[in-house]
Structures are given as structure tokens and as C-alpha cells.
Amino acid sequence: MNRIASLILICGLVLLFMISCGPKKTKEQLYAEALQFEKQENFKEAISTYEQLINDYPRAIFADSILFKIGQIYSNNLLDFENAINAHKQLIKKFPESKFNAQSLFMIGYHYANSINDTTMARQYYEKFLKIYPEHELASSVQWELDHLGQDINEIDFLKTGTFEETNQDSGNPKPKNTN
């Protein structure tokens, strides 16, 4: 009798486990759920759901944009710059042809320079950016960051005076430059 009771108990537990697992959520369901968490400003749950989406659907065509989004949430909402850097590094490693790689390289360098104060690592990533993406729209920003790497923002001349001028090579006259 004891043996039959054990068998019934095991079968019941297996059945309960199978029912509780339920069907796997679709990528659309997970994405909608993560967006909802973001709207509710529950950023840790949003990241967790985005990570589940990437783990469950690693070949989804938008997986690279999800990793970029995770990096942005860590950076902008949680101020967790180490994890932001890790998300951007993961994006570059997993998706070497992603359209987000240039932005991710920039963000890695930016966080090392401005959030973590590791100018050696910042320089490494900024130089890598310029080598790979010399014509990218962010290249001038990267060059500016490199030119002012390690400087206190309050000691940069044009920021103290509120004007940013560069010498015009042709005439020698100062040429206003857009700071945006």
C-alpha cells in the first residue's frame, strides 16, 4: 500500500509541476510585459523580463536593440554604470554587425570617462570607436571627449566663458562652433 501511495504522490507532483509551468510566453508577450514594467518605472523587473526575452529568443531580430535598451535603463534609470557597460559589451560581442555597436562603443567610453573615472579604459574605447567608425556622426563627440579626457569640466575654457570657438584654418579668425 505504501508503494501505491508513493506512486500516486509522485504522479501528482509531476502533474502539478507540468500544469504550473504552463506554455512559454511569446516574444511579443515578454516585450509587452517589459514595456509595461518600464512604464511603471519598475526598471529591475523590466530588465529581468528583457533578459528573459533574450535568453528565450536569442535569435530574435531585435535582440540587439533589447541589449542596447538594457544598457540605457541601467545607465539612465538605475545609474548602474558597470552593468550598463556590461550590457553594451555583450551587445558588441553577440551582435558584431549590429547598427547599435557604434553607440555602444561610445557609451562604454563615456561611462568609463564620466561615471567611473577610468580614463585608461575610456581612451581605449574612444580610440577603438574612431578606428572603426571614423565617419560616424558621433566621431566628433568622441574626439572632443578624447581631447578633454581627465579634465575637470569646470576647467575647460569654453565652458567657463559660455562660448566655444575654434580657429578657422583659412582666415585665422575665430569660427563659432555648435556645441549641441
Model-derived features: positions:
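Acidic, polar-rich low-complexity tracts and alpha-helical solenoid repeat scaffolds
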Residues: 2-5, 17-180
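Sec-dependent signal peptide hydrophobic core
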Residues: 5-13
